């Protein structure tokens, strides 16, 4: 929040100015004290409204569930409140958080990437698909508004910075879209037309089983509509009649046609079900990209979340 935000102007600067003016009018000799007191008030107000990063990588904290919005029969967006309305998670672009819960007498920990960003203060959103065998995802479905969840972070090897490469290719499957969405939003928000400097080109291959499985399709389509540097190619196992996207699994030919060719100034990001990621590692290697490591590092050409 800017020091000269409307909230600070109406809540600190104007009252302080009126206080000093009133003191000068009624008791001029106390004006220096009034000025000093007003300065303290303004400083406190501005500082207290400054966004505070609340994540702690070493300790779990409890955050209260504020809202639950069902996207489909098994996909929900969970909104968790931060302690103060001006608080932010403090999550670097490309990183994720850990959620923990005691299930069956044991503590279970899973990683998730928020679909919200630090531009949105006071809360964070998680898009979660409930799987039959998913411990934390099933636990979240039982969580009621007002109850808390244990959260720790940030974590992860990916920290996106503007123009870290010329062109990014992305391959996502299912809920693997969440870290991609976070990065795509950050890039487009930081375009020169928006006052930033990020000129990175982005191509996304997004694979799903059925049309209804395409998560955040409206949001992705809107981003692609407003930014000609971002393109999407959908792949479905069970496409509807008249489908013009990809069919079946993501193939090397699709990657070759849709994503940037191997080069020192590009990256390919992978996120999705383990069998898919494993297949994409082999496919990218066969196309001449640097072989993906078992555990990815930031400098890798092919990075797996």
From Swiss-Prot:
Membrane topology term: Single-pass membrane protein
Binding-site positions, FAD: 141-156, 167-204
Reaction it catalyzes: 2 Fe(III)-[cytochrome b5] + NADH = 2 Fe(II)-[cytochrome b5] + NAD(+) + H(+); 2 Fe(3+)-[Dph3] + NADH = 2 Fe(2+)-[Dph3] + NAD(+) + H(+)
Location of the protein in the cell: Mitochondrion outer membrane
Source organism superkingdom: Eukaryota
Record field: transmembrane: 29-49
Cofactor dependence: FAD
Keywords: FAD, Flavoprotein, Membrane, Mitochondrion, Mitochondrion outer membrane, NAD, Oxidoreductase, Transferase, Transmembrane, Transmembrane helix
InterPro entries the record matches: CBR-like (IPR001834), Cbr1-like_FAD-bd_dom (IPR008333), FAD-bd_FR_type (IPR017927), Flavoprot_Pyr_Nucl_cyt_Rdtase (IPR001709), FNR_nucleotide-bd (IPR039261), OxRdtase_FAD/NAD-bd (IPR001433), Riboflavin_synthase-like_b-brl (IPR017938)
Pathway(s) of this molecule: Protein modification; peptidyl-diphthamide biosynthesis
Enzyme class: oxidoreductase
Domain FAD-binding FR-type positions: 58-161
Keyword Signal included in the entry's annotation: no
Keyword tRNA processing attributed: no
Assembly notes: Monomer. Component of the 2-(3-amino-3-carboxypropyl)histidine synthase complex composed of dph1, dph2, dph3 and a NADH-dependent reductase, predominantly cbr1.
Stated role: NADH-dependent reductase for dph3 and cytochrome b5. Required for the first step of diphthamide biosynthesis, a post-translational modification of histidine which occurs in elongation factor 2. Dph1 and dph2 transfer a 3-amino-3-carboxypropyl (ACP) group from S-adenosyl-L-methionine (SAM) to a histidine residue, the reaction is assisted by a reduction system comprising dph3 and a NADH-dependent reductase, predominantly cbr1. By reducing dph3, also involved in the formation of the tRNA wobble base modification mcm5s 2U (5-methoxycarbonylmethyl-2-thiouridine), mediated by the elongator complex.
Family the UniProt entry places it in: Belongs to the flavoprotein pyridine nucleotide cytochrome reductase family.
UniProt protein name: NADH-cytochrome b5 reductase 1
Organism of provenance: Aspergillus niger (strain ATCC MYA-4892 / CBS 513.88 / FGSC A1513)
